[in-house]
A protein has these predicted regions:
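ALDH superfamily catalytic-core signature
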Residues: 18, 214-353
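N-terminal Rossmann-like NAD(P)+-binding subdomain of aldehyde/semialdehyde dehydrogenases
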Residues: 1-117, 293
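Residue-level signal for inorganic ion chemistry
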Residues: 15, 51, 73, 95, ...
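Structural signal for hydrophobic packing residues in well-ordered secondary-structure cores
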Residues: 40, 44, 59-66, 70, ...
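Short amphipathic alpha-helical coupling segments at ligand-binding clamshell hinges
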Residues: 50, 54, 58, 69, ...
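Rossmann-like NAD(P) dinucleotide-binding subdomain of oxidoreductase/dehydrogenase enzymes
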Residues: 109-250
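A general structural signal for well-ordered alpha-helical segments in protein cores
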Residues: 33, 55, 70, 91-92, ...
Length: 353
């Protein structure tokens, strides 16, 4: 029996349901994996230039469809379209980069050894690689995973995050339109048990995950038990350090801009700010001034001084709970920290300990 869990696309601006998707069935998963495995046997024999041709077509289609792609993620996870457009820029660059450099990266390397001989390092394709992708950069993260894997002669099966199925679907359609062989890039709507099944299947040779520490531990454990190659990119706790020699208004604006991008939902965003004591109060005042000036914005019509919805209403309400715990532990909220309206808008907050 197949798992019939459903994914609902909820517009974070309005919280309205726009579309519903269902998980792939067990039979469909087997068919997808079988097709990917057969495609790998042909794709691995392609020259680097033949592989590069497909990647360049994918890059061009991303470029051609940038407005549509940016609107999809604006409606799906609240990202402002100008930021979505910037994400597409990165995707185009990544696919073209690996198309241009894949042959160099994949070339045999001759390495002199200490006995006067020569060792040869030969790079060969692995096979079917499974990618478990996050929602916060739904195109960029897929490109970082898929482009080098495909250029190296592998095929990929991508399980995207539950809240961005339209983005996932759009990527697969681009590969189809680029003339990629069926099974080269496969999008799957799948549950945890189905991903476990893939990891433990002999036809799958590797898995890559970008996500939480908990998910990483689970994937790494399963991959280790199955002796599969595993790549993990997990979260960070980046600090923004402010010295007393700084221009305080400029430093506060930079810190704010780095924190507010993608509504703060990025692993590279500064999670905390460490400020030298003699400028601490002035720096906090500057941040509060900036935060207080921001008002709700429409992700489809971005403007300076606007903040946009979180990825979902649940995500916004989770932040409220985090702030509640912080206050209980002694933190002070200077401004913001509330969910407003029907959607997933969370007023920008400044808290200190």
């Amino acid at each position: 029996m197949g798992c019939m869990a459903k994914y609902r696309v909820q517009n974070p601006k309005t919280n309205e349901i726009e579309k519903t998707y269902e998980n792939i069935t067990s039979d469909e998963l087997e068919q997808a994996l079988s097709t990917a495995d057969e495609t790998f046997k042909q794709w691995r024999e392609k020259s680097y230039e033949e592989r590069a041709e497909v990647l360049r077509k994918v890059a061009q289609l991303f470029d051609d469809k940038r407005d549509e792609l940016a609107r999809i993620i604006a409606n799906e996870m609240g990202k402002a379209v100008d930021q979505g457009d910037g994400e597409v820029d990165d995707v185009v660059e990544i696919f073209n980069y690996y198309a241009d450099n894949g042959a160099k990266f994949g070339a045999d390397e001759e390495i002199p050894n200490e006995r006067g001989g020569t060792s040869i390092m030969r790079k060969i394709p692995l096979g079917v690689i499974v990618g478990v992708m996050p929602w916060n950069f739904p195109y960029y993260q897929v490109a970082r995973f898929a482009a080098p894997a495909l250029m190296a002669g592998n095929v990929v099966m991508v399980k995207h995050a539950n809240i961005c199925p339209q983005s996932a679907e759009a990527i697969e359609k681009i590969f189809d339109e680029a003339g990629a062989p069926k099974g080269l890039y496969t999008n799957i709507f799948a549950g945890h048990s189905q991903i476990s099944k893939l990891i433990n299947d002999d036809r799958v040779q590797g898995v890559s995950l970008t996500g939480s520490e908990g998910a990483g531990r689970s994937i790494a454990s399963q991959a280790g038990q199955a002796l599969k190659k595993c790549v993990l990119e997990l979260g960070g706790t980046d600090a923004y350090i402010v010295l007393d020699s700084t221009d305080i208004p400029a430093a506060a604006k930079t810190a704010w801009d780095k924190r507010i991008g993608n509504t703060g939902q990025a692993c590279t965003s500064n999670k905390r700010m460490i400020v030298m004591e003699d400028i601490y109060d002035e720096f906090v005042d500057e941040l509060v001034k900036i935060a207080s000036s921001y008002t709700e914005g429409d992700p489809l019509n971005p403007e300076e001084g606007k903040f946009y919805p979180m990825s979902s209403r649940d995500a916004a309400e989770n932040l409220v709970q985090q702030l509640k715990i912080a206050v209980e532990e002694g933190a002070k909220i200077h401004v913001g920290g509330e969910v407003t309206g029907k959607g997933a808008y969370f007023t920008p907050a400044v808290i200190t300990d």
